[in-house]
């Protein structure tokens, strides 16, 4: 997992509440267990005018130009602004995979579904909870936003908005540590235990 560093980006304002994981990545695209390749089908039913299926050439599909992700001014955005209860519905980890593969590094919302919120951290995405007043400020601005995880701040128009984050999760993101890399920190201890265990119980 890549280290999470301070960055500046435009934000995509997706002003909808209760966006569920089936809207984020529809069920027909869940056959793969790879973490890459899902970005092209992020919000598939909203981005395209036809019905998408796995294996389709998305470059030939008709785009819904009214949908915010398809508008040219929001291309290459790394921040997503949404309303309350983002990521509700089924617990599919493909949802953060799709968001990450599209290029999002941070999602800002008044609230998140618990499982989705936890899955974001496991996949290197920073989910930020902000109150409605701050969300209104962010939605109303077209300026770029700076996310400083180390300082726990959102900066826009020379205004800083602090945010809360668990210190352990913050450390993991800053250092690019996922569950596998955390486990590998103890690889020597694991190998020593295995050697001792199988020497002692050599009939296993």
Curated annotation (Swiss-Prot):
The source's domain of life comes to Bacteria
| EC annotation from Swiss-Prot or TrEMBL | 4.2.1.33
| A family per Pfam | Aconitase_C
The catalytic activity, as recorded, is: (2R,3S)-3-isopropylmalate = (2S)-2-isopropylmalate
Report the SS bond pairs.
Answer: none
**Molecular function terms from GO:** 3-isopropylmalate dehydratase activity
Q: Keywords on this record?
A: Amino-acid biosynthesis, Branched-chain amino acid biosynthesis, Leucine biosynthesis, Lyase
GO CC aspect terms: 3-isopropylmalate dehydratase complex
GO terms for biological process, alphabetical: L-leucine biosynthetic process
Family matches, as CDD domains: IPMI_Swivel
- So, what pathway does this thing act in? Amino-acid biosynthesis; L-leucine biosynthesis; L-leucine from 3-methyl-2-oxobutanoate: step 2/4
| Annotated family | Belongs to the LeuD family. LeuD type 1 subfamily.
Q: Which HAMAP family match?
A: LeuD_type1
- Summary of subunit composition and partner proteins: Heterodimer of LeuC and LeuD.
Quote the function comment for this protein.
Answer: Catalyzes the isomerization between 2-isopropylmalate and 3-isopropylmalate, via the formation of 2-isopropylmaleate.
Protein name listed in UniProt: 3-isopropylmalate dehydratase small subunit
Q: Which organism is it from?
A: Vesicomyosocius okutanii subsp. Calyptogena okutanii (strain HA)
């Amino acid at each position: 997992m890549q280290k999470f560093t301070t960055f500046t980006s435009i934000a995509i304002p997706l002003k909808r509440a209760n966006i569920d994981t089936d809207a984020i990545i529809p069920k027909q695209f869940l056959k793969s267990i790879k973490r890459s390749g899902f970005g092209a089908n992020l919000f598939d039913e909203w981005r395209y005018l036809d019905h998408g299926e796995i294996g389709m050439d998305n470059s030939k599909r008709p785009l819904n130009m009214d949908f915010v992700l398809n508008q040219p001014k929001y291309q290459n955005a790394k921040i997503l602004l949404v309303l309350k209860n983002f990521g509700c519905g089924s617990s599919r980890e493909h949802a953060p995979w799709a968001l990450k593969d599209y290029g999002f590094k941070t999602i800002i919302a008044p609230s998140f579904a618990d499982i989705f919120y936890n899955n974001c951290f496991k996949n290197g995405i920073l989910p930020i909870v902000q109150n409605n007043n701050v969300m209104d400020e962010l939605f109303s601005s077209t300026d770029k936003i700076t996310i400083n995880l180390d300082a726990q701040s959102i900066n826009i128009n020379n205004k800083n908005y602090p945010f809360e984050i668990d210190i352990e999760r913050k450390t993991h993101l800053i250092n690019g540590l996922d569950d596998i890399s955390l486990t590998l920190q103890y690889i020597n201890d694991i190998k020593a235990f295995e050697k001792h265990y199988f020497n002692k119980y050599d009939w296993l």
